[in-house]
């Protein structure tokens, strides 16, 4: 009797934790609002120089974006709502890192690779800014 009860409690705790997990899209929206709200505070130190990618395809410049974020975080007074902003940005970085881990998952047949390549090129042709 104890084991089924423990399993039920464990299952209930897992369902509750999943239900409370905030979707990443909500975190991104909240972060955009916080970024707009605290922009003056974040730009108050005019001597800080941050790497700004010249490439318009943001997907290719994630490393540089988060490098600049770390510099900004270290140069900004901590506490309050700004702390929440940096926590959200940290969550977004962790999410992106987890997604990047899926890039080399398994080997497949040539047809499946070509299907993936075709989908990738389709996204590239519609969503990326093409430079001369």
Swiss-Prot record:
InterPro entries: 4_helix_cytokine-like_core, IL-5. Pfam families: IL5. One of its GO terms (molecular function) is cytokine activity. GO terms for cellular component: extracellular space. It is found in: Secreted. The keyword Glycoprotein applies. Residues 1-17 form the signal peptide. PANTHER family: INTERLEUKIN-5 (PTHR48491:SF1). Homodimeric cytokine expressed predominantly by T-lymphocytes and NK cells that plays an important role in the survival, differentiation, and chemotaxis of eosinophils. Also acts on activated and resting B-cells to induce immunoglobulin production, growth, and differentiation. Mechanistically, exerts its biological effects through a receptor composed of IL5RA subunit and the cytokine receptor common subunit beta/CSF2RB. Homodimer; disulfide-linked. Interacts with IL5RA. Interacts with CSF2RB. This is Interleukin-5.
């Amino acid at each position: 009797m104890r084991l089924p009860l423990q399993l039920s409690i464990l299952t209930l705790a897992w369902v509750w934790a999943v239900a409370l997990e905030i979707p990443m899209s909500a975190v991104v929206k909240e972060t955009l609002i916080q970024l707009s709200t605290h922009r003056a505070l974040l730009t108050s130190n005019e001597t800080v120089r941050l790497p700004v990618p010249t490439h318009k395809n943001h997907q290719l410049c994630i490393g540089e974006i988060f490098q600049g974020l770390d510099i900004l975080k270290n140069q900004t007074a901590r506490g309050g709502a700004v702390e929440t902003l940096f926590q959200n940005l940290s969550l977004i970085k962790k999410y992106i890192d987890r997604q990047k881990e899926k890039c080399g998952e398994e080997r497949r047949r040539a047809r499946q690779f070509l299907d993936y390549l075709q989908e990738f090129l389709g996204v590239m042709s519609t969503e990326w800014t093409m430079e001369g």
